Amino acid sequence: MMKAEQKVLKRFNKGCVDYHLLEDGDRILIALSGGKDSLELVRLLAQRARIYKPHIEVEAAHIIMDNIPYETDRSYLQDFCAENGIKLHILHSSFDESTDPRKTRCFLCAWNRRKTLFEFAVNNGFNKIALGHHMDDILVTLLMNITFEGSHSTMQPSLPLKHYPLTIIRPLSLVHEADIRQVAEELHFTKQKALCPYEETTRRADMQAVFQHLERLNPEARYSLWRSVFMV
């Protein structure tokens, strides 16, 4: 096992234990976008499912938005899941912009993706949905919420949903993006080339630059930010 793999696995295991993400009897549905983070999440949870305790079942779902002009490499995702012993479900969804012209395409797309994912999970006996957000995602979201919303909040490692009998888990919560990127390169993950033409990235990209600047000022900045949210 390579050094980056070891670091990711160690932090993945620590996150699962510290935040009680995996319990005996869990049926977990992974939201597989096709990016490096969700691919690594499939690989790690597939390995974890082969361990006797806790006994968990893991499958994945990839959602295609029928009215958005982009497409991922579906055959690669199917092959990747098969190689890891994970069943992949291909789900279709769409949205009608005219239903609420005040909402952006990105909001409507994300809302409908999640609704499709949640309903499929409930109807097929899953009790948890695993998302591929890592520590960098969580801390950049924190900075965005502080800067633009005046809210000291961010995504949680574990979040029970109010309107569905489901819990959202983020097993990569303690994993650094740089380590996932290194694993993706070493294991030759195929990068998805077709990007959504409507993707809104400017604000998040700006906050990522702020986060990187904070780490240059203080190499321990990420841990200080993390403690400010999760260890108060």
Describe the function of each predicted region:
Residues 65-67, 95-97, 159, 175, ...:
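Residue-level detector of flexible, active-site-proximal loop/helix-junction positions
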Residues 1-143, 148, 178-186:
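ATP-dependent adenylation/nucleotidyltransferase module used to activate substrates
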Residues 136-216:
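Catalytic subdomain that performs nucleotidyl-dependent activation
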Residues 202, 220-232:
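A short, charged, Gly/Pro-tolerant segment at domain boundaries
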Residues 4, 8, 73, 176, ...:
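Alpha-helical structural motif
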Residues 48, 107-116, 149-154, 206-223:
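Short, structured secondary-structure boundary patches
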Residues 94-97, 131, 195-199, 221:
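Short, surface-exposed helix-loop/turn micro-motifs enriched in polar/charged residues
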